Regions:
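Polytopic transmembrane helical bundles with strong interfacial aromatic enrichment
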Residues: 1-457
Length: 457
C-alpha cells in the first residue's frame, strides 16, 4: 500500500487508532469531574442552572464514554495482533498494569455509571452525587494506570531481562518511574483544559446565536474560570516535564529543538521556526534566539544541550515531526493562556458575554485542546523512536510477522469502520450541543410522560 512495508503500515494503523482513542478519554476525564462539580453545586445552592447543565452534559458524556471504551478495546487488541513481539517481551509488566486499570478503574466507572445516567429521581440525591463522584474518580484512576504503563515504556526501571523477556523486580519502581509524575500531571491537566475549551466553545456558539440564558452564561463563565487557573499551570508542568525528558531522553529533546551540533562550544539557541533536514544534518531556514535554548533547558547561559550528532544515526528520532508537533502544542498553549487572561479583562469590564470577536475566538479555540493533546502525544511517541521500550527494545523488534497485503487490508478496514461509527457519534454529540441546556427541561418532561405511560401499560 503506497509502497509501505508491513512494519510501517502497523505503525500507521496504531497511530491512527490511538489518535482516535485519546480524544474520547481526554473529554471523558474532564467532563466527569465537571459533572461532579455541577451536581455538588446544585446540591449546595439549588440553582436550577447547575441542574440543567448537569443533564445537558451527562448525555454528551455518555456518548463520549461509550466511544472511548470501544476505541480503547480495539487499540488494546493490536498489542496481540500487530505487536506480538512487544507483548511477548514486556507483557509481564504492561499486562498487569492494564489489568489493574480494569480492576480498579473500569469496574468502578461501570458500576456507578448506570446510577449516574439513569438514577436521577430513582435514588437519593446524595447517593446520586456519590455515583457521579465515583465515575469521576474512576477516570482519574484509569489515567493513573495507563500513564504508568506508558511512562515505564519511556523511562523503564524495576526490571531485569531473563531469557529474552522482561521480568519485574520492583513494582513500586515500575509504576513510579522517573517520568511518571510529570506525564500524569501533564496529561490530566491537558484533559481538564481540553474539556474546558470544549464546554466554552459550546457556550460561545449559543451566545453568538443570541441565547443569553443564565445557564449558557454560567457554562461560559465556569469554563473560562477553570482556564484562567489551568492554562498557566499547564505551561509550568510542561517546563518541568521537559527538564525531566532532557535528563532521561536527551535525543528526544535534541530532535524537538532541531539542534544538531555542539562542535562550536557555544550555548544552544532557541530555534523558533525552521525545517530540520535529516539528510544534511542541519535545520534549514532557522529563525533562532541566541542562548535561549540553554537558558530554558539548562538554566544556564553557557551550557549547551545534547545535539543530534551526539547519537548514532539509527537512534535519532524523526526531527521534522517532533519539531513541528511540539511547536503546534506550545503555540496552542500560548493562545489558551491569552484567551484565559483576556477573559479576565472582559469580565472586569462586564462585557464577557457580549464581545462578539472574543466569542468567535472561543468558538475557534474549542478543538484546540484536543489538537494540542494529539500534537503532544506525537511529540512524545515519535520522539522515543526507534525504541518501543526506551533503550531496551526497538520498535522493529516488537512488530508481528504479517504480510504487506494483510496490513493494507486491515488499515483500510479501520479507516472505513472508524469513519462510519465515530462519524455518527460525532454527529450525535454536535446535535445535542446545538439543542442547548435550556432544551433539557422539555426533554425531561417528555421522558417523564413516556415513563408514566409505559408504567400504566
Amino acid at each position: 500500500m503506497f509502497g509501505l512495508d508491513a512494519f510501517m503500515l502497523a505503525r500507521i494503523q496504531f497511530a491512527f487508532t490511538v489518535s482516535f482513542h485519546i480524544i474520547f478519554p481526554a473529554i471523558t476525564i474532564g467532563l466527569a469531574t465537571y459533572l461532579a462539580v455541577l451536581e455538588g453545586l446544585w446540591l449546595k445552592t439549588r440553582n436550577p442552572d447547575y441542574q440543567k447543565l448537569y443533564h445537558f452534559w451527562s448525555k454528551i458524556f455518555a456518548v463520549n464514554f461509550g466511544m472511548g471504551v470501544v476505541s480503547g478495546l480495539v487499540m488494546a487488541y493490536q498489542f496481540g495482533t500487530n505487536w506480538s513481539g512487544f507483548s511477548d517481551f514486556a507483557g509481564s509488566i504492561t499486562g498487569p498494569l492494564l489489568t489493574y486499570e480494569v480492576l480498579t478503574a473500569f469496574f468502578l466507572e461501570a458500576g456507578f455509571l448506570g446510577v449516574m445516567l439513569f438514577g436521577w429521581r430513582r435514588v437519593g440525591e446524595k447517593l446520586h452525587f456519590f455515583a457521579t463522584s465515583m465515575v469521576a474518580l474512576g477516570t482519574i484512576i484509569s489515567t493513573f494506570w495507563i500513564l504508568a504503563s506508558n511512562s515505564w515504556m519511556q523511562t523503564p526501571q524495576g526490571y531485569e531481562i531473563v531469557d529474552g523477556r522482561v521480568v519485574p523486580t520492583d513494582w513500586f519502581a515500575i509504576v513510579f518511574n522517573p517520568s511518571f509524575p510529570y506525564r500524569l500531571a501533564h496529561m490530566s491537566v491537558a484533559a481538564f483544559v481540553s474539556s474546558a475549551l470544549f464546554v466554552g466553545a459550546s457556550a460561545a456558539w449559543h451566545l453568538l446565536r443570541g441565547n443569553q440564558s443564565t445557564a449558557v452564561k454560567t457554562m461560559f463563565s465556569m469554563s473560562l474560570g477553570i482556564l484562567v487557573f489551568l492554562a498557566p499551570l499547564q505551561a509550568v508542568i510542561g517546563d518541568v516535564h521537559g527538564l525531566n525528558t532532557l535528563e532521561h531522553q536527551p535525543a528526544k529533546i535534541a530532535a524537538i529543538e532541531g539542534h544538531w551540533d555542539n562542535s562550536d562550544g557555544k550555548p544552544t539557541p532557541l530555534i523558533l521556526f525552521g525545517m530540520p533536514n535529516m539528510e544534511q544534518e542541519r535545520t534549514d531556514y532557522a529563525l533562532e534566539i541566541p542562548v535561549l535554548g540553554s537558558l530554558i533547558l539548562r538554566h544556564s547561559l553557557t551550557e549547551p544541550i545534547p545535539a543530534l550528532k551526539d547519537f548514532p544515526k539509527e537512534e535519532r528520532p524523526n526531527s521534522p515531526i517532533v519539531f513541528w508537533s511540539f511547536r503546534i502544542m506550545v503555540g496552542l498553549g500560548l493562545l489558551m493562556i491569552f484567551q484565559s487572561f483576556y477573559s479576565m479583562w472582559l469580565r472586569k469590564k462586564n462585557t464577557l458575554y457580549n464581545s462578539r470577536w472574543f466569542l468567535k475566538f472561543s468558538l475557534f479555540m474549542g478543538p484546540s485542546g484536543l489538537i494540542a493533546i494529539l500534537a503532544g502525544w506525537f511529540t512524545t511517541e515519535v520522539g522515543r523512536q526507534p525504541w518501543v521500550v526506551y533503550g531496551v527494545q526497538k520498535t522493529r523488534d516488537a512488530v508481528s510477522a504479517h504480510g504487506d497485503l494483510q496490513m493494507s487490508i486491515s488499515l483500510l478496514c479501520f479507516l472505513v469502520v472508524y469513519s462510519l461509527v465515530f462519524g455518527f457519534g460525532y454527529y450525535y454529540m454536535i446535535h445535542q450541543i446545538k439543542k442547548g441546556p435550556d432544551a433539557i427541561e422539555h426533554d425531561e418532561h417528555d421522558e417523564h410522560d413516556m415513563t408514566t405511560v409505559s408504567g400504566r401499560i
